[in-house]
Amino acid sequence: MVGAGEGDRVGGGAAVGGGQQFVDRSKVRILLCDSDPSSSREVLRLLCNCSYQVTCAKSPRQVINVLNCEAGEIDIILAEVDLPVSKCFKMLKYIARNKELRHIPIIMMSNRDEVSVVVKCLRLGAAEYLVKPLRMNELLNLWTHVWRRRRMLGLSEKNFFNDNFELALSEPSDANTNSTTLLSDDTDDKPKENINQETSTSNQHEYESNPSDAEPKQKGTPEGLLVSTEGGDQASSPGVMFSRPIKTNLRVAESSAFLAYVKSSTPTTSSFDSELQKGGNRLDSSDHRGNFSSTTDRSDTGTDVNIRDKEAFEMPVQYPVVCFSSSNLHLERSNEGQNDASGTPPVYHFPFYYPGMMDHGMTHPPVQNFQGNINNAQVHTPQTLLPQYNVYPQCHGVSMMPPFQYNPAGMSIQSNQLPTQNMWPQASSTPMPEETCSRSERRAAALAKFRLKRKERCFDKKVRYVNRKKLAETRPRVRGQFVRQANYTDITSTGDDISEDEDDDPSSREVEMVSSPE
């Protein structure tokens, strides 16, 4: 609810001068209006569990009569919307128009949660709209509406606070106690006393160890910065500042789930903090003795912090920078102090050759620039640690880099003692491949080839069996049938017989026909 935060602010701001004030809900009087008997009894029971004073009414007419008689004693009106609804809205209008009743906040409750009903109730002057079934934490914060309405109208505030701690709050085991109460009486001053004892003992140790330093601190510190302990320790160490920030004590009941969670999840003091504290004590003791040493013997305990490893984790990794120029090739080491302690000379990685990044006619640094001992280099540096570069194939159209010698930093090797694999290979005179034609030229060549192929096409009717066609052309056809050709010699020799028979039977005459192929 909106009023919960304001209620806490009121309760917290009222704690002045050692005494603490708490909300006394028994001073709040509520006028309950509900036409349903069962619902009215349930709401009445919840309000009584919250220690409110309740006056019941069954209709809007009874509410108006009670307000006309006891308007100054009613603090809150808790009414049902279905009285019916029309009479409920008339009651809201009547109370909003009456100047003597405007200071009473009206809280509506109903089983319905339609937006239209809620908006109309709020427009007619309702302070809040609650949906049944009501919850305990909603009813516990009803008194905040009274405080807000009076403050908004500029009226005098009612005293809802009680100085008596035991009368204001009940036992946490009771049924009428909820976790949303401002404070619980189960919180006593035991945790505060324990904290005060710890701080007082630590301050006492500091005062005993440095008695000469404590007096000027007290004299030079303004009164506003002095922190005095509470309870019985206030007189033991007055005016002594805490060596650490004050730990705020959250007052929560021991039976609450929050305290059980905090107890289970509170981490113990880490070993790293304890070791740092031990190291500070050792440094303080060494200052008093006047003995300063560069290293501290930490072999007595097995859990001491390795400062060297810690610095190694904290410092970022830095790499040597290799610089190139167009005139000469010079190597610059940006980190001189990051040498390995193992004794093996570091091998610095050279970048690959990129076309256009270095001049092909550059001068190479002589071998004498690298100072060192060839014997140490031969002992510590095997041949496998000397990589060879420029072994990757070069791009077409770019000449290879000429060979030059390179050595790890801190080594001086004669040219006759260098292995052959330490040389950059000379470029072989390989013929340059012809430049491939562009995409448009390839497309034009493909189109020309397609046109030539199209000209060679033949759209005539294809014959499947050529030999059969030739044989069919040589045979004569009569009415679609194949016939044999007649022999001319036989016809001439028997010409007379044929002429005689022609008159008698013309059908028996053999007719010579020459068929032409179709």
Swiss-Prot record:
GO terms for cellular component: nucleus. It comes from the Eukaryota. The keyword Transcription regulation applies. Belongs to the ARR-like family. Interacts with PIL13. Interacts with PIL15. Keywords: Biological rhythms, Nucleus, Transcription, Transcription regulation, Two-component regulatory system. It is found in: Nucleus. Induction: Expressed with a circadian rhythm showing a broad peak in the late day. Residues 172-241, 266-305, 483-518 are annotated as: Disordered. PANTHER family: TWO-COMPONENT RESPONSE REGULATOR, TWO-COMPONENT RESPONSE REGULATOR-LIKE APRR1. The gene is PRR1. Residues 29-147 form the Response regulatory domain. Residues 443-485 form the CCT domain. Residues 196-212 have a biased composition (Polar residues). Pfam families: CCT, Response_reg. Controls photoperiodic flowering response. Seems to be one of the component of the circadian clock. Expression of several members of the ARR-like family is controlled by circadian rhythm. The particular coordinated sequential expression of PRR73, PRR37, PRR95, PRR59 and PPR1 result to circadian waves that may be at the basis of the endogenous circadian clock. This is Two-component response regulator-like PRR1. GO terms for biological process: cytokinin-activated signaling pathway; phosphorelay signal transduction system; rhythmic process.
